[in-house]
Amino acid sequence: MATAPVKKKKKVNVTQDGIVHIKATFNNIAVTITDVTGNTVSWSTAGKNGFKGSKKNTPYASQVTAESAAKEAYDLGMRKVDVRIKGPGSGRDAAIRSLQNAGLEVKTISDITPLPHNGCRPPKRRRV
């Protein structure tokens, strides 16, 4: 029986500066760390870290997600980051705090959540 070919991990040349993109929706959180030109260095989501269902949108899930992405980028040599947050989800602050605890120096924090100029009609209010 033939064995599957072993995939080599792509070697990434990382500078010390980078950008952390945090996308916090109502259902999930995704953290992507790129270099200044936009090439992905590491990424992580709440589902990738073992959270399922409604637990994916908790501050603890965002903390674990940001820590795992930051640890991988730190091991590759990244030290200073700019943070860009998008979305209304909970755990935005916890993600930034865990980036700092992982050893990355946060230079700037900017909120790039897209705001409609009276665009689409929002979903109706829930009645539970």
Swiss-Prot record:
Function: Located on the platform of the 30S subunit, it bridges several disparate RNA helices of the 16S rRNA. Forms part of the Shine-Dalgarno cleft in the 70S ribosome.
Subunit and partners: Part of the 30S ribosomal subunit. Interacts with proteins S7 and S18. Binds to IF-3.
Similarity section: Belongs to the universal ribosomal protein uS11 family.
Top-level taxon of origin: Bacteria
Tagged with keyword Ribosomal protein: yes
PANTHER family, alphabetized: 40S RIBOSOMAL PROTEIN S14/30S RIBOSOMAL PROTEIN S11
Keywords, alphabetical: Ribonucleoprotein, Ribosomal protein, RNA-binding, rRNA-binding
Record's protein name: Small ribosomal subunit protein uS11
CC per GO annotation: ribonucleoprotein complex; ribosome
Pfam families xrefs: Ribosomal_S11 (PF00411)
GO-annotated molecular function: rRNA binding; structural constituent of ribosome
Organism taxonomic ancestry: Bacteria, Pseudomonadati, Chlorobiota, Chlorobiia, Chlorobiales
GO biological process, one term: translation
Gene3D superfamilies recorded: Ribosomal protein S11
InterPro entries registered for this protein in UniProt: Ribosomal_uS11 (IPR001971), Ribosomal_uS11_bac-type (IPR019981), Ribosomal_uS11_CS (IPR018102), Ribosomal_uS11_sf (IPR036967)
